[in-house]
Amino acid sequence: MISQLKILGLWWSISTSESVDTNGNLGEMRSTKLQIALSPSMAVAQQGEVLLHEIFEAIVCQLGIKLEHSKLQALSASLHQVMVDNAEAFSAIGANEMPIVQLPLLTSIPTSLP
């Protein structure tokens, strides 16, 4: 697992912490410390979704957005599934190999209006 992420210009540390388990959570976002802590006992299959959820928590916190936790959970779970189902596209975007939006090339520029 990665040890840090840049989220909206700030570096956040990513770690595992037993204290997350004692709170009954799989992950925690600690905004005052710029930390995301993940449960060391969660299944590997859960790690990506939980990390993405905590990233959403950090973004919402940094932007001061009021968002119900259930809606944040739905958004993060949905985006995680899109990313998993389309891993090739997301790895290409991350490698700057594929622009997110492809615009058609202009073959000629109109010089007058119709």
Model regions and ranges:
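Active-site recognition of the HExxH zinc-binding catalytic motif
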Residues: 49-61
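Metalloprotease/metallohydrolase-associated module, dominated by Zn2+-dependent proteases
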Residues: 1-46, 62-114
